[in-house]
Amino acid sequence: MQDAAPRLTFTLRDEERLMMKIGVFVPIGNNGWLISTHAPQYMPTFELNKAIVQKAEHYHFDFALSMIKLRGFGGKTEFWDHNLESFTLMAGLAAVTSRIQIYATAATLTLPPAIVARMAATIDSISGGRFGVNLVTGWQKPEYEQMGIWPGDDYFSRRYDYLTEYVQVLRDLWGSGKSDFKGDFFTMDDCRVSPQPSVPMKVICAGQSDAGMAFSARYADFNFCFGKGVNTPTAFAPTAARMKQAAEQTGRDVGSYVLFMVIADETDDAARAKWEHYKAGADEEALSWLTEQSQKDTRSGTDTNVRQMADPTSAVNINMGTLVGSYASVARMLDEVANVPGAEGVLLTFDDFLSGIETFGERIQPLMQCRAHLPALTQEVA
């Protein structure tokens, strides 16, 4: 088998530009991000996520993010049928960490912005200023229909109008502690939130449609996007370029943070064998549900996160970019990511989170030029 990661052929940028941020996408739902009967099967718990984030902090990860999922895909694996709640989980994790940045996700159809503003200010206090909010509009209709709060299918074409008003209320309340915002979706009447966050609250998003990127260009501190393909670490470059161009139109610097799964082992062949094993156990019933739901939004264009998730090419891990190889191969591929214009960080998942973070910290990260600035490890973590 050929080396999964070809030798780098580019000239690395200067050291400052190569200081790429790394985060962990914690498994708030059962089984993480592998829709396979052959993958590790586990329930989400606070203790599991605590161990993951504390390991990530020990190995100098920069941030941890949790999603929000309100209904799963079913199938033999009951994929994502079992989920914790994002804000309460991250509040708990904020209390048991000291350096790593913590981000929770707000499903904006379920939570009024004034409540999110107050919850965020509370976790800012718990964390000592290490908290931020990921805003999502909602794409999986059954999540909201089951609670009677789906606003109708025209929401697909208006969701970023809704989110624009939402974030304006948040900015009012975090900035001055007061909002009198009047819009089509929200009406504030001397709405108050105090105490306010101790530092400016970071807002992040994950838009790949034109509307999503335009929103991020105006309001987000950075924007998540999917990596693409297997061992094609720079295939997301056109998406990062679109985000960079959108941000230039608003005069802001909004970097792209790219989602990848790492499947690593001592050799390329051993890592590839794991990947093929996971694919062979794909939960077809759960994948069919994902495909069906991804087709409900016909108004956001073809280049969206949801469309990519359902692509049959690598649906077993929701088509996030996948880096499969030896520790050295994965390190080289991540250095390639760092060289893409507009790429400022990566958000990583693992086939096995606890062992994956440990091997990443011990065997992969020390080989990465874009992480050469990190201090040496000083202690063991349980």
Curated annotation (Swiss-Prot):
Annotated keywords: Flavoprotein, FMN, Monooxygenase, NADP, Oxidoreductase
Record flagged with keyword Nucleus: no
Domain of life of the native organism: Bacteria
Binding site for FMN: 68-69, 134, 143, 159-160, 209
Family matches, as HAMAP family: RutA
Function: The FMN-N(5)-oxide reacts spontaneously with NADH to produce FMN. Requires the flavin reductase RutF to regenerate FMN in vivo.
Protein name: Pyrimidine monooxygenase RutA
Protein source organism: Escherichia coli O150:H5 (strain SE15)
Upper taxonomic lineage: Bacteria, Pseudomonadati, Pseudomonadota, Gammaproteobacteria, Enterobacterales
